[in-house]
Amino acid sequence: MATQIAPHGGRLVDRWLRGPAREEALERARRLPRVRLDAREAADLEMIGDGALSPLTGFMGQADYRSVVAEMRLASGLLWALPVTLAVSRAEAESIREGEEIALEDPGGRLMAVMRVAERFAYDRGAEAARCYGTTDPAHPGVRRLLRQGEVYLGGEVWLLDRPPAPFAEYRLTPAETRAEFARRGWRTVVGFQTRNPVHRAHEYIQKCALEICDGLLLHPLVGETKDDDLPAAVRMRAYEAILEGYFPRERILLAVFPAAMRYAGPREAVWHALCRKNYGCTHFIVGRDHAGVGSFYGPYDAQRIFDHLDPAELGITPLFFDHTFWCRTCGAMASPKTCPHGPEARVALSGTRVREMLYRGEAPPPEFTRPEVARVLMEGLQAAARPQSVET
């Protein structure tokens, strides 16, 4: 068996309780104070349990939080790009004592985990926004969420009990499962691809370029919470299935979902996404134009430049940077400024945002934008989502 890349921090975390320990915790949880998580916190909790956020074993305490916000490092000195926190109101925090256990519920009220609260601490919203998002503007979705959440963070280790029902069950692979599948297929090098947008020709081009140098591709669309105008995850997943069916060698692709919610933290989130994919077993990670960006808050290549300031050995996963890609009418092919000599008049600009805008207007993207099979899936999915649902009486 090929030696696999080590998880971040050296050990793949597993915070799931099983057998008698789980049964005892379930019984205990019935008597514990309950804290309901929002969608992002629930996704983070699931990923902590699965080891996707290794080396984290719970929601961050004050030392880790402050160090990550200020220095992009855990208190231990280990590289880590974004805080992973549990926010509650001041009133809720006053009812919880440090050292006691609480039960954590998903947004629907289903029990997910128990947590031993090691710390309660206030935090500076402005400082977190400025350092992590590069702005304090409430028009930024990450900042807006930060300004609306509770005033106190709870830190402490968690133990997972139940995984709430979720879509795409066949694609919800844990890091241990993706690593096992990579080993089964004999992949020594694996490139991860993160996306929240509908698949288009630029994505296809980048993925195939990466497959020229790696044994396999982990196509890892994010299916957690996104902006309201982002395409529904169910529609995107059907589009990924359609393009894999007709345009990729299936034996070299593993399609799995990434449960995380989007932070829209641009450069920092690009590093965070890379570290997560390292935990899933990827040796390489694609960072394209405006990775994890939103609006005009970041420059188009800020998410690539941040890696210039990181020690490659400490990062432990190789980023693959791609320039802006387009369809060149003269070349009759996908290209980038590195491979095409023709001017702007020959270039058809491609982006997930542009495809999304056309779809919402009811327009089928041209074949230079996306494959016809994919366009059909996207159009049908959006029309079904917009169709009024009948109500039986």
UniProtKB/Swiss-Prot annotation:
InterPro entries: ATP-Sase_PUA-like_dom, PUA-like_sf, Rossmann-like_a/b/a_fold, SO4_adenylyltransferase_pro, Sulfurylase_cat_dom, Sulphate_adenylyltransferase. Belongs to the sulfate adenylyltransferase family. Its EC number is 2.7.7.4. One of its GO terms (molecular function) is ATP binding. One of its GO terms (biological process) is sulfate assimilation. Pfam families: ATP-sulfurylase, PUA_2. It comes from the Bacteria. Pathway: Sulfur metabolism; hydrogen sulfide biosynthesis; sulfite from sulfate: step 1/3. This is Sulfate adenylyltransferase. It catalyses: sulfate + ATP + H(+) = adenosine 5'-phosphosulfate + diphosphate. It is an enzyme of class 2 (transferase). CDD domains: ATPS. Keywords: ATP-binding, Nucleotide-binding, Nucleotidyltransferase, Transferase.
